[in-house]
Amino acid sequence: EEKKKTLKRTFGMREAVTITVGTVVGVGLFTTGANVVGDLGPAVILATLVAMLISIYPSLLYAEMGAALPYAGGTYQYASLGIGKPFGMLAGWNFIISLVSVTSGEALAFSFYFKTFFSALGIELPVSDTVVATLIVLVFIVTNVRGIEMTGKLQNGFMFFFWGVAIIWFLMMLPNVNMPNFVQMPDFIAKSTPLSFIASVSMIWWCFAGFETCCAMGEEIKYPQINIPRALILAPFIVFAVNSAFQWFLVGIVPISEISSLATASAPFAEAMKTAGILGFPLVLLAAGIAFGGDFSTLNASIAVPPRYLFTMSRDGAMPKIFAKVHPKYQTPYVSIIVLGLLSAFLIASNSMIYIASLSLFADLFYYVIGITASLCLRKRHPELKRPFKAPGIMIGAPISIIIYLIMMTQLDKEAMITGIIWCALGLVIYAVCRSKYKNEAQEDLSGVIEEEIPSPEEKKKMDKEFKIWSIVVACAVVIVLVAYVIPFLIG
């Protein structure tokens, strides 16, 4: 029985990176992250840089916890052990609704770009956005129930397709980039305040939220003590490079006098191309890359990850035991996958990207505050824990990170706060009922989950080579993007 309730380790570092980045690169980048270009113009690079910087240290904290405790469930497990079960439940509960919201928002974004793709070809689809979005969620529910190997292979395929299309689109857009746009600041920038800049950083930070996604699948990652820290070291820099590159093209192709229109656009990239008069094949290519690459990669990952949290919480007695059921053939938490997928479909019915984004952002910030606090408490309560990776300066870095994230929470609208509080209250009620019902049951034996795996010398050498290649490529991407923003100032 225990064997059935332990998930299968099949992911390597590459899958850990692509699933993590795939969860992040999508709805935020193509909606709120691009909307901020309309608020800040070329100064958007500063907000994106700040968003990356405030993600790096928390990412290192998660690298430490993920390597030491490679469970399915991530922050839920870390907070349960470090702070206490109720905080673990709140962390897991908010992580779940955050990514369920991302799934819903991503499905709606897919629907728009899917229809834009056909519209650019002269074909108008007589189907509503909500119907298309719901259907694509159902497709990914099936692929995720079928097995984690399929999930990983699909994720790699989606990410590489996205980047293949993105590179071609970048090359096609280069002749349309107007360098003076980066030097001229829009008139409305003068009205910006420190609080409005913090609000912009918060919106762009949503593009980074989820940088620790691979921790939630720690029980399915091979050699997690090595692969989880490596994936988390790379993730914030990859997300920065991706967001900054796409923002650069938005700034470059849209006339500076009309760039403010992007702030309220539901699909900023399509709006930007239409404003710049760039139609035909480039628009078809953009829609294909976003819909079948960026959106698909995020949908695949955001449907795959939350069920691992619910699975672990159920296995631990914090949620109804039915969610701990593992498929006898595919060894996946199929009940959790199906239920959360249907919850995503329910949110899609709201057809409101603003509501979905606000709910997700509240949940993101709240569970990160809990997770960062857990890293501090784990150091104090469990000093004996074997830590293959250790974050430096935790006594300074963790409190500063908590303060920053709490400040960002003050920029959320009241509706998001109220919705998030109601969701937390509901979770606490379910938790109390389950703890009362299962209080006499023994905890699952997870000793096999946290047992360290040692790769052979040959395999370790191969893993080191892969990480080195990824590190070089990511470093080059970050440098290239930063140089791209500096060049317009150098050439006058």
Regions of interest found by a model, annotated:
Residues 114, 128-179, 191-192, 232-237, ...:
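Membrane-interface loop-to-helix entry segments
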Residues 77-78, 84, 116-121, 187, ...:
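TM-loop-TM module centered on a large, flexible mid-protein loop between adjacent transmembrane helices
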Residues 1-34, 38-43, 55-63, 71-72, ...:
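Membrane-interface "cap" regions at the ends of multi-pass membrane proteins
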Residues 35-39, 47, 56-137, 141-145, ...:
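Hydrophobic transmembrane alpha-helices that form the core helical bundles
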Residues 322-331, 368-417, 433-473:
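C-terminal membrane-solvent junction of multi-pass transporters and transport-like membrane proteins
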Residues 11-30, 136-139, 188-246, 250, ...:
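Hydrophobic, membrane-embedded alpha-helices of multi-pass small-molecule transporters
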Residues 160-188, 247-254, 368, 372-385, ...:
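Hydrophobic alpha-helical segments and their helix-loop junctions in multi-pass secondary transporters
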Residues 1, 80, 107-131, 165, ...:
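Helix-loop-helix connectors at the membrane interface of multi-pass transporters/channels
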